[in-house]
């Protein structure tokens, strides 16, 4: 098995810790909030409020299931527009009350179904990109599995973007890339090599700011590592002025 094949499989592994696992383990007294106040609740996006060392934080994540029944509830981690609108509602609420935002990203992409398109999938993603770029609070985004296309970026316009070591981040799946370029989806891992989708490759290109190592760590050790990184980073970002937060976020993404 090649290194890229192993990383892609690890990123997609159904046994990986989910957004909800991290939210409950890292943040004290995590309380979920539901619904976009327009259509319905989307099980693919979780969000709520928790406490990190006494600091209130808004936590949002894209949630995959751990078995078939759970995956059906979570739509296999592919959000509908109401999921992105729920996320935006919680982010605007965080801004209103001065809470920093932490997002956990794990999706192959936004759901491409007819109903999702009819309800404005593209608009929901675009609005999140626009609104996140101007939020007046610190934002940290962590890719914990797959970071697929605009569906991931809709929660990823942050002051700091981190990746777990065995996660991937790309404009589309390796299978999609291979199908478009070579009309042969079986060449997916060859495509993945060309796409430069791994954490260390993206760190080298300055697409992400930090790689959180996983090798040799238990789940609890990984949770502890992320919690410590968040404590340090939020302490630093919280000392910035609103103008510094917004300008740094803008410049971070403009440089691409």
Curated annotation (Swiss-Prot):
GO CC annotation: acetyl-CoA carboxylase complex
InterPro entries on file: Acetyl_CoA_COase_a_su (IPR001095), ClpP/crotonase-like_dom_sf (IPR029045), COA_CT_C (IPR011763)
Main location: cytoplasm
Catalysed conversion reaction: N(6)-carboxybiotinyl-L-lysyl-[protein] + acetyl-CoA = N(6)-biotinyl-L-lysyl-[protein] + malonyl-CoA
Domain CoA carboxyltransferase C-terminal per the UniProt entry, residue ranges: 1-236
Keyword rRNA processing listed: no
Keyword Lipid metabolism: yes
Pfam families the record matches: ACCA
Keywords, alphabetical: ATP-binding, Cytoplasm, Fatty acid biosynthesis, Fatty acid metabolism, Lipid biosynthesis, Lipid metabolism, Nucleotide-binding, Transferase
EC code(s) of this entry: 2.1.3.15
Pathway recorded for this protein: Lipid metabolism; malonyl-CoA biosynthesis; malonyl-CoA from acetyl-CoA: step 1/1
Molecular function GO labels: acetyl-CoA carboxylase activity; ATP binding; carboxyl- or carbamoyltransferase activity
Enzyme class: transferase
Gene Ontology biological process: fatty acid biosynthetic process; malonyl-CoA biosynthetic process
Subcellular location: Cytoplasm
Matching PROSITE patterns: COA_CT_CTER
Purpose: Component of the acetyl coenzyme A carboxylase (ACC) complex. First, biotin carboxylase catalyzes the carboxylation of biotin on its carrier protein (BCCP) and then the CO(2) group is transferred by the carboxyltransferase to acetyl-CoA to form malonyl-CoA.
Family assignment from sequence similarity: Belongs to the AccA family.
Subunit organization: Acetyl-CoA carboxylase is a heterohexamer composed of biotin carboxyl carrier protein (AccB), biotin carboxylase (AccC) and two subunits each of ACCase subunit alpha (AccA) and ACCase subunit beta (AccD).
Name listed for the protein in its UniProt record: Acetyl-coenzyme A carboxylase carboxyl transferase subunit alpha
Species assigned in the record: Streptococcus gordonii (strain Challis / ATCC 35105 / BCRC 15272 / CH1 / DL1 / V288)
């Amino acid at each position: 098995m090649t290194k890229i094949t192993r990383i892609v499989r690890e990123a997609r592994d159904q046994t990986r810790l989910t957004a909800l696992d991290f939210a409950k383990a890292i943040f004290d007294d995590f309380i979920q909030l539901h619904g976009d106040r327009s259509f319905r609740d989307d099980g693919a996006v979780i969000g709520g409020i928790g406490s990190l060392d006494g600091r209130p934080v808004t936590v949002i994540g894209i949630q995959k299931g751990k078995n078939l029944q759970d995956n059906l509830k979570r739509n296999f981690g592919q959000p509908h527009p109401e999921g992105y609108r729920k996320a935006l509602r919680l982010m605007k609420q965080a801004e209103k009350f001065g809470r920093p935002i932490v997002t956990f990203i794990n999706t192959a992409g936004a759901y491409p179904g007819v109903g999702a398109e009819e309800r404005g999938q593209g608009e929901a993603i675009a609005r999140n990109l626009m609104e996140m770029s101007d939020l007046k609070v610190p934002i940290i985004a962590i890719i914990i599995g797959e970071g697929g296309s605009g569906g991931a970026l809709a929660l990823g316009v942050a002051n700091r973007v981190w990746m777990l070591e065995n996660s991937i981040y790309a404009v589309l799946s390796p299978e999609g890339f291979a199908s478009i370029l070579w009309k042969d989806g079986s060449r997916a891992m060859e495509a993945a090599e060309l796409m430069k989708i791994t954490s260390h490759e993206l760190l080298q290109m300055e697409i992400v700011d930090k790689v959180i190592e996983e090798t040799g760590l238990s789940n609890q050790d990984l949770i502890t590592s992320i919690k410590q990184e968040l404590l340090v980073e939020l302490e630093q970002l919280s000392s910035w002025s609103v103008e510094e937060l917004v300008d740094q976020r803008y410049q971070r993404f403009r440089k691409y």
